[in-house]
Amino acid sequence: MANNIPIGSPVRTKAIINRYFVKAKKNLGQNFLVDQDAILGIVEAADIQPGDQVIEIGPGIGSLTEQLLLAGAKVFAYEVDDSLPEILHNELPKKIGEQSLNDRFKLLLKDVLKADFQNDLAGFFDMKQPIKVVANLPYYITTPIIFALSESDLHFSSLTLMMQKEVAERLEAKPGNKEYGPLTISVQTEMNVKIALEVKSTSFMPRPKVDSSVVVLTPLQERPKIENRKHFIWVVKMCFSQRRKTLNNNLKALIPNAKEREALISKLGVDPRVRPEDLTIDQFIEIARNIPAK
């Protein structure tokens, strides 16, 4: 009977935790998702279809993995906790079936930030076809993972990521919003951002201190023309180095000459007293174009 209960249900999760003596590791940011509606919401937000190739980051005890596989996906999972493979290989076949699991699931004990996607996925995924990324991310590595994925050579069609609500709001922020900053600009020059659903802290075991959001990121069809992305990101970060100061003040470190600085601000068509959070992405691109790359 227990085999018919989803891994992500509170009763099954508790049974697995007790059977395998699992303890959520704070240093890995582990919180097990025990809200089946939220789990199915992630699968729906990612628009998982039979045959989809999915990278899952941090499968944990398999709550989301199970539903991805039941939806027909082929799943390649990255995990850093070496105590979890036994659980995944014992529990997933109960609803998926041993043969189907062998054909459609592969687990690699590796930090995704050290991933070599081309080599890791070769032989399991068709690298000519789009790949989806789905993950319930540990809060402490959310931003590094987003940067790593957006800058990788991975041909992905979407990233569906559970993250801290505050980070999700930063990704979706518009100019003039206090959450708008370097992360916002870096992501929005590469991807469309959509918050698909909110997930309360009560949906996790153990319960975190903050709520979460599920964000869907999809590559822009037409990206802004940025000649040197590394230089652009550096300029943006410099402009936000003292975010409560005016643009004119923040630009002093980049353009020491007052007349040159005034000319650029005039070219942007903004008040010198404007703060960086009020500038559009196009205006940041224009600033970067007028500052020599180092």
Swiss-Prot record:
One of its GO terms (cellular component) is cytosol. One of its GO terms (molecular function) is 16S rRNA (adenine(1518)-N(6)/adenine(1519)-N(6))-dimethyltransferase activity. Its EC number is 2.1.1.182. The keyword Transferase applies. It is found in: Cytoplasm. Signal peptide: none annotated. Keywords: Cytoplasm, Methyltransferase, RNA-binding, rRNA processing, S-adenosyl-L-methionine, Transferase. InterPro entries: KsgA/Erm, rRNA_Ade_diMease-like_C, rRNA_Ade_Mease_Trfase_CS, rRNA_Ade_methylase_Trfase_N, rRNA_adenine_dimethylase, SAM-dependent_MTases_sf. It is an enzyme of class 2 (transferase). It catalyses: adenosine(1518)/adenosine(1519) in 16S rRNA + 4 S-adenosyl-L-methionine = N(6)-dimethyladenosine(1518)/N(6)-dimethyladenosine(1519) in 16S rRNA + 4 S-adenosyl-L-homocysteine + 4 H(+). S-adenosyl-L-methionine binds at residues 31, 33, 58, 79, 111, 136. It holds the Pfam family RrnaAD. Specifically dimethylates two adjacent adenosines (A1518 and A1519) in the loop of a conserved hairpin near the 3'-end of 16S rRNA in the 30S particle. May play a critical role in biogenesis of 30S subunits. Belongs to the class I-like SAM-binding methyltransferase superfamily. rRNA adenine N(6)-methyltransferase family. RsmA subfamily. This is Ribosomal RNA small subunit methyltransferase A. It comes from Lactobacillus acidophilus (strain ATCC 700396 / NCK56 / N2 / NCFM).
